[in-house]
């Protein structure tokens, strides 16, 4: 039986020394949104709690300003 070794999760924001997550940085935010438009939980991404809260707030602000969609595109 083959053993499955999961790669170690790490917080990208801590490693890069990010102080604040910006809602205008769409490339970063898109990496933490699923195909259906949901915010991916920190237990999957490995993001620390402090940055996960900032991430959620930034994604919600970007959605409110129509920079990011709330859901995936309907009808496809």
From Swiss-Prot:
InterPro entries: Ribosomal_bS18, Ribosomal_bS18_CS, Ribosomal_bS18_sf. Signal peptide: none annotated. It holds the Pfam family Ribosomal_S18. PROSITE patterns: RIBOSOMAL_S18. GO terms for molecular function: small ribosomal subunit rRNA binding; structural constituent of ribosome. It comes from Azotobacter vinelandii (strain DJ / ATCC BAA-1303). Part of the 30S ribosomal subunit. Forms a tight heterodimer with protein bS6. GO terms for biological process: translation. Keywords: Ribonucleoprotein, Ribosomal protein, RNA-binding, rRNA-binding. Binds as a heterodimer with protein bS6 to the central domain of the 16S rRNA, where it helps stabilize the platform of the 30S subunit. This is Small ribosomal subunit protein bS18. HAMAP family: Ribosomal_bS18.
